[in-house]
Every structure is written in structure tokens, then in C-alpha cells.
Amino acid sequence: MNWLEAFILGIIQGLTEFLPISSTGHLYLGRHLFRLDEAGLFLDTMLHIGTLLAVFIYYKKEFIYLIKNPFSKLMLLLIVGTIPAVVIGLLFKDFFEDISKTGITIGWEFLVSGFFLYMADKQKNGRKKMDDITYKDALIIGSFQAAAIFPAISRSGMTIVAALWRKLDRETAAYFSFLLSTPAIVGAIILQFVDVFQGKAESISSTSLIVGTLSAAFFGYIAVSWMIQYLKRHSLKVFAYYVWGLGILILMLQFTDVF
């Protein structure tokens, strides 16, 4: 893989990690387009590190607070919200990944993701701020995050949807969703590094790794800041229409040699 392909995949990862359209699903598509297959596993890991850097930079004040106050309510909310994804991920990760490596399943997953995004906008706007979030809210939002074990189900999309259903206001829904993404991204990095050290990934140039990581970090930061502002006043339906269109296109492409 050359550095330009890594740069493009970094853009895809950075933008789609925080827009509710599934980064993993888009990376699967990117692999097929570039014919990368498992050769891109190590790069995938570095791309996740890039998006993790984006979250750390954007939320630097919050993470400094968490380090200084490890037993704060915010820390406990993040722990509670992470539990469902940890349990589901450890028990069923390989199973769900194996059944989701075909264009048919990825296409249907995009369609399902679009349904949740569309339905979320039918809810009345909530008024809960960060201080109003309960542990029950965090657990329910985290349970929706666990659904993103399916590659084309958007993690940020599901958590934002759940947060809106739990009556968080729109800005807080995105804000908490992206904070909650941190342990999920860390977990994904750890699991991917295990696969890398087990020899499941081919070598890739250091230039491509650096370019891909920095690209993911830069565009990830842009996506986080833009999405929080966008959701204040705009609908999620545009993302629902996008993933519906993408899902239908992928299903139609089953009649070609793309998948």
C-alpha cells in the first residue's frame, strides 16, 4: 500500500468514526476498493490510534479532569457505559466479524443503522445536560454502543440515538457519545494489536503508517467539532438517507465482482 492510499483511508476513518455512518463499514469498503484485505490490519490499528488522538486533543480538559478525579461521576458514567461493549466484544467479536464480512450483511447493516438514525429524529428534543445523566442512561447508551460490534452499524450513530431517546439534549448527546468512544477505541486498538502480534497482518511501510495516522487524527478532530455543532440545529435524517443509499448500492453490487 502506498502513502496516498493510507492518506485516503485515514480520511475515511477520521470522518466516519465520529459521523454516524460507521467507520468500520467504510473501511471494509475501502479495503475492497483498494484490494487490501488483511494487509491493512496494522494500518487499521494505527488509524484507530489517530482517531483516539483526535478525541484526546478535543477533550483534553475533560481527560485532565478525569486523571485528577478518577472517582468522579463522569468517570463512573464512562465505566458503566463501557461495560456492555466489553462483555459483548469479548464474547462475540470473532463470531460477528465472521458473519459480517460479506457485502450482503454489510449492506443490510447499513440499512438497519439508517432506520435507527431516522427514528431518533421523531423524538422530542430532550433537556438533559451532562450533570443530569444517570447511571441507567449510561448503561442504556452503552448497550446501544455494543450493537456496533456489527461492522456497518455506526457506534457514534447508535450512542447518539440512544442518548436522544434518553432525553439528553442534542449537543450533550453528541458530547457524551464521543467521550464514551474513548474506551471503545482503546479496546479496539488492544484487540487489533493482539491480531497483529499473532501474525495476522502483513508489513506496511512506516511512511504509510505515519501518513494514515496523522490523516485520521486531523480529520477525526474536524469531524468531532463539526458534528457537535451540527447536531445542535440539524437532523440526523441526512445521515439515514446516506447509509440507506449506500446499503442499497452495496446490495446491488452483489451482482458484480466488487464484493
UniProtKB/Swiss-Prot annotation:
Single Gene Ontology MF annotation: undecaprenyl-diphosphatase activity
Topological relation to the membrane, as annotated: Multi-pass membrane protein
Main localisation: membrane
Reactions mediated catalytically: di-trans,octa-cis-undecaprenyl diphosphate + H2O = di-trans,octa-cis-undecaprenyl phosphate + phosphate + H(+)
Transmembrane stretches, start-end: 1-21, 39-59, 71-91, 99-119, 133-153, 174-194, 208-228, 239-259
Alphabetical list of InterPro entries matching this protein: UppP (IPR003824)
Keywords: Antibiotic resistance, Cell membrane, Cell shape, Cell wall biogenesis/degradation, Hydrolase, Membrane, Peptidoglycan synthesis, Transmembrane, Transmembrane helix
Single biological process term from Gene Ontology: regulation of cell shape
Keyword Cell wall biogenesis/degradation: yes
Any one annotated GO CC term: plasma membrane
Family, per entry: Belongs to the UppP family.
Physiological role: Catalyzes the dephosphorylation of undecaprenyl diphosphate (UPP). Confers resistance to bacitracin.
Other facts noted in the record for this chain: Bacitracin is thought to be involved in the inhibition of peptidoglycan synthesis by sequestering undecaprenyl diphosphate, thereby reducing the pool of lipid carrier available.
Protein name per UniProt: Undecaprenyl-diphosphatase 3
Originating organism: Bacillus cereus (strain ATCC 14579 / DSM 31 / CCUG 7414 / JCM 2152 / NBRC 15305 / NCIMB 9373 / NCTC 2599 / NRRL B-3711)
